[in-house]
Amino acid sequence: MAPTTITALAKEKTLNLDFVRDEDERPKVAYNQFSNEIPIISLAGLDDDSDGRRPEICRKIVKACEDWGIFQVVDHGIDSGLISEMTRLSREFFALPAEEKLEYDTTGGKRGGFTISTVLQGDDAMDWREFVTYFSYPINARDYSRWPKKPEGWRSTTEVYSEKLMVLGAKLLEVLSEAMGLEKGDLTKACVDMEQKVLINYYPTCPQPDLTLGVRRHTDPGTITILLQDMVGGLQATRDGGKTWITVQPVEGAFVVNLGDHGHYLSNGRFRNADHQAVVNSTSSRLSIATFQNPAQNAIVYPLKIREGEKAILDEAITYAEMYKKCMTKHIEVATRKKLAKEKRLQDEKAKLEMKSKSADENLA
């Protein structure tokens, strides 16, 4: 299937079958049924060790990471005007005509640009979203030909936004390092040379949102993800393997911080890798901007501290590139097994119907 854009499909009365998920994967909680279980942590006073705020912030982050692997931060130092401008420009990009957005399509292995939905290898349902990706750090990784030229001001604003998020990411890594009982700079050192990828998600309104997902259930592979979401709602989290879900309460100007697989392994499993998904709705489009703070490909992945009585959750040290490959292989294997099981179930149901039909014909004869 090659839709022009998801925005175009949003005008249909029924959901295209390529986006329909199995019943057990469909949303269990509404996009706006908000929960206050994810803590909102003020970073005010973080840079001033004299007032005792830093240890208190560390304690709150420890609890959040042990419970969910997710927390929200306010008083983070990112200018509200920059946040508003980044959000405005992002919405203006997705409002462009399809042919202008498709000038930056990522087909053919292009690195960065505009993507219409995604489907995991082995999966059989697509995500209800469009997104733009750009790689901003290290700076020599930037390919400005893949950064949209419209709307005006996109490049200059995204450069500033990326720079400010790098600073915030560095602060958060220091606090997380202390929260793990390490020296302030240990987590940053373990990343070797921090990479940054920014992914801007746009979720158009959906004709049948109860049948699909904006983004399938997953964990992020990197160290941390810093997410800016609008006030619509749709980010959901689980901590019991997907049995129950909560919708994260949007907070004006806040950033949601997710711990990724890399951070989970470095903490020796003490801190959860945030298990999350995104749902959509039929009344309001939604925008979120995810900034992935990832280690270098050659960074070594192994617990930085193993507490007394614990065992390492990894058998041996591996590189981040190897860890990423293993995680993706596992996701693909799970999706493939599920797809094959579904196909077998459908075949069995078809065979039963054929048997019933044959039996009915014999009775009539």
UniProtKB/Swiss-Prot annotation:
Residues 194-295 form the Fe2OG dioxygenase domain. The keyword Transcription regulation does not apply. Keywords: Cytoplasm, Flavonoid biosynthesis, Iron, Metal-binding, Oxidoreductase, Vitamin C. GO terms for molecular function: flavone synthase activity; L-ascorbic acid binding; metal ion binding. It comes from the Eukaryota. Its EC number is 1.14.20.5. The keyword Cytoplasm applies. Involved in the conversion of naringenin to apigenin. Acts via a direct 2,3-desaturation of flavanones instead of a sequential hydroxylation/dehydratation mechanism. Belongs to the iron/ascorbate-dependent oxidoreductase family. PANTHER family: OXOGLUTARATE/IRON-DEPENDENT DIOXYGENASE. This is Flavone synthase.
